[in-house]
């Protein structure tokens, strides 16, 4: 857990279920127009089914997309899947103001997921060779960030109770044969996505040494 940084609270926005592209565009607009006084924000969302291809993505890792749309995006990393039953947390953080290194933010995101899973009795770990969070040899959370104008966007996606079949249509994050898992298969009493999303936001805030302020309005 990080020490309290003395920064203002992070605004917590719950977006519900949204298509990917409008949320991505809203993240970019927020990042491009924010200034030194703009609040940091966490966005919690579930996306409609979509494959997103990161800047390092290769076409050969997209095996059989079928009817699921493919979006070439500007985050780091390679291809992944988003869909209902998966909690996505986007940390829109002024990393310069917070004196936060990219590796530090990545580690905070991974540790937040690890802490959440530990609270439910699941042992998980990060891997130095493949960003994300793993339970044994299976992947439960994917991670991809972008830093622009000294601020972060994109984030982390945690599989809670969604359909994992679409992951078989890709090489997740560029790793052929990567097995995926989800929280509902690892615990006897799995919370719903909304509860897990709030837990994840709280875990990440603790890692960053920040407080959260829930917001009634959504930014996108």
From Swiss-Prot:
Annotated SUPFAM superfamilies:
Class II aaRS and biotin synthetases
Q: What is this protein called?
A: Octanoyltransferase
Positions bound to substrate: 75-82, 142-144, 155-157
Listed under catalytic activity are:
octanoyl-[ACP] + L-lysyl-[protein] = N(6)-octanoyl-L-lysyl-[protein] + holo-[ACP] + H(+)
Q: Which family does it belong to?
A: Belongs to the LipB family.
Q: Which InterPro entries match?
A: aa-tRNA-synth_II/BPL/LPL, BPL_LPL_catalytic, Octanoyltransferase, Octanoyltransferase_CS
Where is it mostly found? cytoplasm
Q: Where is the BPL/LPL catalytic domain?
A: 36-212
What extra comment accompanies this record?
In the reaction, the free carboxyl group of octanoic acid is attached via an amide linkage to the epsilon-amino group of a specific lysine residue of lipoyl domains of lipoate-dependent enzymes.
Annotated site, Lowers pKa of active site Cys, chain positions: 139
Tell me the Pfam families matching this sequence. Answer: LplA-B_cat
Per the record, the domain of life is Bacteria
| One GO CC annotation | cytoplasm
Q: In which pathway does it act?
A: Protein modification; protein lipoylation via endogenous pathway; protein N(6)-(lipoyl)lysine from octanoyl-[acyl-carrier-protein]: step 1/2
Q: What does this protein do?
A: Catalyzes the transfer of endogenously produced octanoic acid from octanoyl-acyl-carrier-protein onto the lipoyl domains of lipoate-dependent enzymes. Lipoyl-ACP can also act as a substrate although octanoyl-ACP is likely to be the physiological substrate.
Q: CDD domains per the record?
A: LipB
Q: Where in the cell is it found?
A: Cytoplasm
Q: What is its EC number?
A: 2.3.1.181
In alphabetical order, the GO MF annotations are: lipoyl(octanoyl) transferase activity
Q: Which residues are responsible for catalysis?
A: 173 (acyl-thioester intermediate)
GO process terms (BP): protein modification process
| UniProt entry keywords in alphabetical sequence | Acyltransferase, Cytoplasm, Transferase
Q: Please tell me which top-level EC class this enzyme sits in.
A: transferase
């Amino acid at each position: 857990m990080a020490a309290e940084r003395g920064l203002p609270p992070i605004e917590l926005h719950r977006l519900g279920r949204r298509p990917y592209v409008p949320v991505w565009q809203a993240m970019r607009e927020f990042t491009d127009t924010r200034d030194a006084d703009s609040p940091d924000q966490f966005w919690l969302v579930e996306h409609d089914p979509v494959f997103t291809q990161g800047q390092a993505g290769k076409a050969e890792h997209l095996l059989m997309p079928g009817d699921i749309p493919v979006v070439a995006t500007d985050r780091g990393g390679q291809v992944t899947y988003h869909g209902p039953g998966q909690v996505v947390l986007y940390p829109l953080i002024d990393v310069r103001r917070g004196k936060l290194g990219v590796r530090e933010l990545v580690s905070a995101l991974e540790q937040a997921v690890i802490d959440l899973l530990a609270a439910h009795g699941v042992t998980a770990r990060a891997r130095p060779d493949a960003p994300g969070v793993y339970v044994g040899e299976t992947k439960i959370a994917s991670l991809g960030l972008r830093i622009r104008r000294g601020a972060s966007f994109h984030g982390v996606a945690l599989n809670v109770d969604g359909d994992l079949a679409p992951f078989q249509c890709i090489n997740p994050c560029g790793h052929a044969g990567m097995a995926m898992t989800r929280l509902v298969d690892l615990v006897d009493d799995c919370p719903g996505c909304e509860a897990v999303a709030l837990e994840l936001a709280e875990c990440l805030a603790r890692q960053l040494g920040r407080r959260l302020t829930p917001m009634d309005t959504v930014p996108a």
